[in-house]
């Protein structure tokens, strides 16, 4: 499989480089690096290509020789990892032609009349985006090396509009991959934004895909959707809502219910890891008294409310 080159996620606020980062997270060798450090490493490669600071030994004409070579890459001159500026990995390798004026032609079985031009955006239009660069053996950045956080510390900040959330899960028992994927994609994730009395505002988080990685873990990409309003049977304590920050809307014997995501996933045979250490406080079974559970009477989209009016494009109105 090739890394994504088109901006098919652009409509959802996802840049091409962010899509490439997600691709390496899913299909890479258990890469543990945040997007900021991944972008910093990409900019280093881009700047060196533009300045022509590559040594002759770096530019190998045969990409196959690069993938089969066992020699360790040399240290990059002038690079140092540190917090605030991002951790620049030690093992970066680039494969490109000696001219480096653009992408090399790729053999294809399609005829000229069958070729379809790629819908490239402004970011892909840069010549550096078209180069067949790659990072082999990205070192984990220091941003992952943090003490364990509690559930509400991890989801203390609401995701920005259009910003997806990536969850990393591990199965607790053997399961069929197709059934596991279908079950994960079918979950109704929501992100609690706040509320008052028995009214709760939440952001729908739709699973875009669920894939199994090479290290026998699962990754689920949650895409923010519409803001919804839920009417609860009982008004919960505001400090207790942190436990339901990321929840799954389920049907129970008492009706619709908001279940914390880690508890809902555990019932399906998954333990949540994400890319931040999760506090090991998930109970073995989610069983609380009816008065302590968030039972939902009705859920409607915020746009469907009579009093809701879309904001005017005119800032003076």
From Swiss-Prot:
Subcellular localization, per the record?
Cytoplasm
Q: Name one Pfam family in it.
A: TEX19
One GO cellular component term, please give it: nucleus
Superkingdom, according to UniProt?
Eukaryota
- Is Cell membrane one of the keywords UniProt gives this record? no
Important for interaction with piRNA: annotated span: 101-145
Q: Spell out the molecular function terms from Gene Ontology.
A: piRNA binding
Acidic residues composition-biased segments? 64-75
Task: Tell me if Cytoplasm is a UniProt keyword of this record.
Answer: yes
The principal location of this protein is cytoplasm
Disruption phenotype annotation: Males deficient for both for Tex19.1 and Tex19.2 have impaired spermatogenesis, small testes and are infertile. They show vacuolization and seminiferous epithelium degeneration as early as P16. They have defects in meiotic chromosome synapsis, persistence of DNA double-strand breaks during meiosis, lack of post-meiotic germ cell and up-regulation of MMERVK10C retrotransposon expression. Number of females double knockout for Tex19.1 and Tex19.2 surviving 2 weeks or more is reduced compared to males. Females display normal fertility. Surviving mutants do not present gross somatic abnormalities.
| Alphabetized UniProt keyword annotations | Cytoplasm, Differentiation, Meiosis, RNA-binding, Spermatogenesis
One GO-annotated biological process of the protein? spermatogenesis
Q: Where is this region: Disordered?
A: 64-113
Q: In which tissues is it expressed?
A: Specifically expressed in somatic cells of male gonad lineage.
Instruction: Write out the function statement from the record.
Output: May be required during spermatogenesis, probably by participating in the repression of retrotransposable elements and prevent their mobilization. With its paralog, Tex19.1, collaborates with the Piwi-interacting RNA (piRNA) pathway, which mediates the repression of transposable elements during meiosis by forming complexes composed of piRNAs and Piwi proteins. Interacts with Piwi proteins and directly binds piRNAs, a class of 24 to 30 nucleotide RNAs that are generated by a Dicer-independent mechanism and are primarily derived from transposons and other repeated sequence elements.
Subunit record text: Interacts with UBR2. Interacts with piRNA-associated proteins DDX4, EDC4, MAEL, PIWIL1, PIWIL2, RANBP9 and TDRD6.
What is the protein name given in its UniProt record? Testis-expressed protein 19.2
**Whose protein is this, by species?**
Mus musculus (Mouse)
């Amino acid at each position: 499989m090739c890394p994504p080159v088109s901006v098919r996620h652009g409509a959802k606020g996802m840049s091409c480089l962010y899509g490439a980062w997600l691709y390496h997270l899913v299909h890479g060798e258990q890469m543990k690096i945040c997007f900021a450090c991944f972008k910093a490493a990409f900019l280093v490669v881009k700047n060196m290509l533009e300045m022509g600071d590559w040594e002759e030994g770096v530019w190998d004409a045969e990409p196959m020789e690069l993938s089969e070579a066992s020699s360790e890459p040399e240290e990059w001159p002038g690079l140092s990892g540190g917090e605030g500026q991002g951790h620049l990995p030690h093992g970066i390798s680039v494969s490109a032609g000696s001219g480096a004026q653009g992408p090399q032609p790729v053999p294809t079985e399609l005829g000229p009349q069958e070729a379809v031009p790629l819908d490239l955006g402004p970011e892909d239009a840069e010549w550096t985006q078209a180069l067949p660069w790659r990072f082999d053996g990205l070192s984990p950045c220091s941003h992952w090396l943090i003490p364990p956080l509690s559930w509400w510390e991890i989801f203390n900040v609401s995701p920005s509009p259009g910003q997806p959330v990536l969850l990393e899960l591990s199965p607790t028992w053997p399961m069929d991959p197709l059934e596991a994927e279908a079950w994960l994609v079918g979950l109704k994730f929501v992100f609690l934004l706040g509320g008052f009395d028995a009214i709760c505002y939440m952001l729908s988080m739709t699973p875009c895909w669920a894939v199994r990685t090479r290290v026998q873990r699962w990754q689920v990409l949650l895409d923010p959707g519409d803001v919804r309003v839920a009417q609860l049977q009982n008004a919960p304590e505001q400090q207790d809502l942190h436990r339901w920050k990321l929840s799954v809307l389920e049907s129970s014997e008492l009706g619709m219910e908001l279940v914390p995501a880690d508890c809902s996933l555990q019932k399906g045979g998954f333990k949540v890891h994400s890319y931040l250490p999760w506090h090991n406080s998930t109970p073995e079974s989610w069983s609380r008294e009816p008065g302590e559970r968030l039972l939902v009477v009705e859920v409607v989209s915020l746009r469907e409310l009579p009093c809701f009016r879309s904001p005017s494009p005119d800032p003076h109105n």
